[in-house]
């Protein structure tokens, strides 16, 4: 290849000398003697064009280099002004024309020792005058230059042309089959100026000529005009050189070498073309393979993408089908469970119905067994009475409680009919019926009642035989006894509810036959002081029951039991025959003390029950025997019967208001005295109000609060708590209602930071009573047997904790007898005596102590020992007094 040769023969011409000289071999692309350049000179721009490039591409590269050269020229012209053209010629044209002609001196041939054969210029390919002129003018045709002077690949020509001529140059397409056409050419065009050309002309010499070394691509460089002129003289033929025999021999030799070199160049060019063709084919095959691989890769990616999409669709379809199957399975399972649940529900309902039927049968059997002893005797049915046929009505049965109405509702007597006849005869036509209507005085006529005939039978007559010592005769009272049942509601009136929001006691639900003349629907808030006493607070008389034992531990034990069975068991307990009970069941605490009396009572009750069952006596509601009304012209027998029930009215003066005020002030003073004695026991006490009231009443009965009986109180405290001394006659024990009212008004049961839950008396009450320094908890010494347990179920710190006896303890719910829930009439002695737990019930005089006064009048005991007690009710308008001798 021409570009890879180490060096070549370079033909260099100079204006000063044309002698040949030997130059040293040099490496490619290395300048041995670089030409020094001025700092102001611009570097030459070399354009390398490969040999296989077409002329169109080479022209494009040349045009681009020309554009760069024009830009450089513009930059240079900006710095130095360009001289103006004279007669259409610039300084370059003048410079080329004024170039020196070739001298007659023998030309110097430069021989490169690195080449096999030296290539020199000969006369066979000289540049004639016409070509020189065209080269000088810049109009050298490439075709002509190549035909006249073919160049080898190792040759380098330096041509200097101006920019204008290069722009106007045209490079036609070269044919590769011509042997004299070069493989490729490159021109390096550099911008120059006249000043630069002059400097290079003066600085050029024979030893230091500018040498252009051919590269691997064998470029053609266009250098300065001095090199161009030198090449002209070198390539040109002179008369002296053409006539010498040495030049002929050299030209023959060089032509042979040139031909040989040309053959080699053609061979290399052919090989190069083959290699280029093979390279192009390989590149085309490579591009085709690359395109094929890219197509295959794109196809694979496309197939992979489609496969992935197809798999995703199949997977989504599978998931959808799976979800649908799962949903269907769930629906089927739910339907199956629903069906199973319905079957179980139906089965459970059937079992429940069956169990209820069996339960009803069992209950009926038990009731039949229980009521077998209490069956009523069947009474013979009365003969049915039928009414006779009258008019349109057929005969019908007259049942009990029915009466047949007469044909005429009014039964006329003979006297009434005679009076009617007289009125009919004496009537006149003067008075009109219309006049009576105009008077607007309608006459009233009451309801006609059907006369009832009381049929008195022997069984329905109640005979009361009694010998009255006053009348001295037996009196028989007959009354028709009504059917056994609930009293008629018409007789007692409606049930009424009396309830107020301020009251703590339960409301009243019952009948009330009293009617007020003051209170009516127009005045519902009026006060009837004659019938009601508005000063009496009924809440004070009401005693709330203490909270019972907690049954939370027993809750849920009998939840599985049938409630109907429990009712049956309770019913069975009521029908247990007498004598069947155990010794300690159904007996009160008082009866436990005497077992003999207990046995006697049980025997009497069993006998009474047997007699009642044997005689089949009916238990019915008692009805009073009403006698009256008694009029002045009544019979003497009725008056004599009712005479012993007559009431005597005592005349007494009216109650003065001052007396009422004195009583209220006296009550306040008494309440203050009681409170002063109650505060030491109440303040700081952890027990309940019932225990405190019981302890205070016991202290009052023993007279511990009397100031003049201190020694007596000391003796009583030293005695045993079980002993119950007699209450002095001059001591009044306050009632439970009064004590509870005082406790609730003057204290509060709460928890404070300094102590736990206990009673705290108000600070103003303590200051008023001058008892501010009372300890908390209280240091009271109890005289009764109490279990000091607070509402928190904690033991009291101040009180002495004493245990109750076994008889006073509360019995468990399982061993409670039935008679505990039944009312029992107490004798007067049991009401006065103390119970087993040490609590004495309040008497009637003690409860009504606020509203009553006890007047004692002790007369001379020697003459007559009698005491008169008068109980006066101050709240009623009438004063009733009862005296006892």
From Swiss-Prot:
Residues 629-665 are annotated as: Necessary for homodimerization, competence for chromatin assembly. One of its GO terms (biological process) is DNA repair. Residues 116-128, 134-157, 182-193 have a biased composition (Polar residues). Residues 1-24, 115-157, 176-361, 536-605 are annotated as: Disordered. The keyword Glycoprotein does not apply. InterPro entries: CAF-1_p150_acidic, CAF1-p150_C2, CAF1_p150_N, CAF1A_DD. It is found in: Nucleus. Residues 536-548, 557-573 have a biased composition (Acidic residues). Residues 251-376 form a coiled coil. It comes from the Eukaryota. Involved in chromatin assembly in DNA replication and DNA repair. This is Chromatin assembly factor 1 subunit A-B. It comes from Xenopus laevis (African clawed frog). The lineage of its organism: Eukaryota, Metazoa, Chordata, Craniata, Vertebrata. The gene is chaf1a-b.
């Amino acid at each position: 290849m021409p570009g890879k040769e180490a060096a070549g023969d370079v033909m260099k011409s100079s204006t000063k000398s044309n002698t040949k000289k030997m130059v040293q071999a040099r490496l490619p692309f290395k300048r041995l003697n670089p030409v020094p350049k001025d700092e102001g000179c611009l570097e030459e721009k070399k354009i390398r064009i490969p040999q296989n490039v077409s002329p169109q591409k080479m022209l494009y590269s040349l045009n681009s280099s020309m554009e760069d050269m024009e830009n450089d020229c513009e930059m240079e012209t900006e710095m130095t002004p360009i001289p103006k053209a004279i007669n259409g010629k610039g300084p370059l044209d003048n410079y080329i024309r004024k170039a020196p002609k070739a001298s007659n001196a023998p030309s110097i041939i430069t021989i490169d020792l690195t080449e096999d054969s030296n290539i020199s210029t000969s006369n066979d390919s000289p540049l004639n005058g016409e070509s020189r002129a065209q080269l000088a003018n810049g109009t050298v045709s490439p075709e002509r230059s190549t035909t006249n002077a073919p160049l080898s690949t190792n040759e380098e020509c330096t041509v200097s042309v101006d920019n204008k001529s290069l722009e106007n140059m045209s490079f036609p397409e070269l044919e590769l089959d011509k042997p004299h056409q070069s493989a490729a050419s490159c021109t390096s065009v550099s911008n120059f100026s006249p000043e630069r050309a002059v400097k290079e002309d003066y600085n050029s010499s024979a030893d230091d000529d500018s040498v252009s070394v051919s590269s691997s691509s064998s470029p053609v460089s266009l250098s300065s005009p001095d090199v161009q002129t030198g090449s002209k003289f070198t390539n040109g033929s002179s008369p002296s050189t053409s006539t010498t025999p040495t030049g002929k021999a050299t030209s023959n030799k060089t032509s042979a070498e040139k031909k040989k070199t040309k053959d080699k160049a053609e061979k290399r060019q052919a090989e190069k073309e083959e290699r280029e063709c093979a390279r192009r084919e390989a590149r085309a095959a490579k591009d085709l393979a690359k395109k094929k691989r890219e197509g295959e890769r794109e196809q694979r990616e496309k197939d992979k993408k489609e496969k992935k999409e197809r798999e995703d669709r199949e997977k989504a379809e599978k998931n959808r089908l799976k979800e649908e199957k799962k949903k269907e399975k769930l629906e089927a399972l739910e339907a199956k469970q629903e069906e199973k649940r319905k079957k179980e529900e139906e089965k459970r309902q059937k079992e429940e119905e069956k169990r209820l039927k069996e339960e009803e049968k069992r209950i009926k059997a038990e009731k039949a067994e229980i009521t077998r002893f209490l069956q009523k005797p069947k009474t013979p049915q009365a003969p049915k009475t039928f009414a006779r046929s009258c008019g349109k009505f057929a005969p019908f049965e007259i049942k009990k409680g029915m009466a047949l109405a007469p044909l005429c509702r009014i039964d006329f007597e003979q006297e009434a009919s005679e009076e009617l006849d007289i009125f009919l005869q004496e009537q006149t036509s003067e008075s009109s019926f219309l006049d009576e209507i105009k008077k607007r005085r309608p006459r009233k006529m009451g309801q006609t009642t059907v006369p009832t005939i009381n049929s008195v039978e022997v069984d329905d007559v109640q005979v009361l035989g009694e010998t009255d010592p006053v009348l001295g005769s037996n009196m028989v009272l007959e009354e028709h006894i009504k059917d056994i049942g609930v009293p008629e509601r018409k007789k007692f009136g409606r049930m009424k509810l009396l309830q107020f929001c301020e009251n703590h006691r339960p409301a009243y639900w019952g009948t009330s036959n009293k009617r007020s003349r003051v209170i009516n629907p127009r005045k519902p808030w009026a006060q009837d002081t004659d019938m009601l006493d508005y000063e009496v607070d009924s809440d004070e008389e009401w005693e709330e029951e203490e909270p019972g034992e907690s049954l939370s531990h027993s809750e849920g034990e009998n939840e599985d039991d049938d409630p109907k069975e429990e009712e049956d068991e309770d019913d069975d307990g009521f029908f247990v025959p007498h004598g069947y009970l155990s010794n300690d069941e159904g007996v009160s605490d008082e009866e436990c003390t005497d077992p003999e009396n207990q046995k006697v009572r049980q025997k009497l009750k069993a006998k009474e029950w047997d007699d009642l069952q044997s005689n089949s006596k009916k238990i019915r509601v008692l009805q009073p025997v009403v006698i009256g009304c008694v009029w002045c012209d009544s019979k003497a027998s009725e008056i004599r019967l009712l005479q012993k029930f007559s009431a005597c009215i005592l005349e007494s003066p009216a109650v003065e208001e001052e007396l009422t005020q004195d009583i209220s002030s006296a009550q306040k003073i008494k309440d203050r005295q009681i409170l002063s004695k109650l505060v030491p026991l109440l303040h700081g006490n952890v027990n309940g109000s019932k225990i405190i009231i019981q302890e205070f009443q016991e202290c009052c009965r023993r007279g511990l609060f009397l100031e003049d009986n201190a020694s007596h109180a000391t003796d009583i405290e030293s005695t045993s708590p079980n002993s119950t001394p007699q209450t002095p006659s001059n001591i009044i024990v306050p009632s439970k209602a009064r004590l509870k009212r005082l406790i609730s008004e003057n204290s509060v049961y709460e928890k404070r930071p300094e102590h736990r839950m206990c009673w705290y008396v108000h600070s103003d009450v303590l200051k008023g009573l001058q008892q501010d320094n009372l300890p908390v908890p209280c240091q009271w010494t109890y005289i009764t047997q109490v279990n000091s347990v607070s509402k928190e179920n904690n033991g009291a710190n101040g009180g002495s904790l004493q245990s109750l006896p076994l008889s006073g303890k509360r019995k468990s719910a399982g061993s409670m007898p039935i008679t505990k829930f039944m009312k029992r009439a107490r004798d007067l002695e049991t009401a006065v005596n103390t119970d087993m737990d040490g609590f004495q019930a309040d008497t009637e005089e003690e409860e009504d102590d606020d509203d009553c006064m006890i007047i004692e009048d002790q007369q001379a005991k020697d003459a007559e020992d009698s005491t008169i007690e008068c109980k006066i009710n101050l709240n009623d308008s009438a004063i009733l007094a009862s005296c006892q001798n």
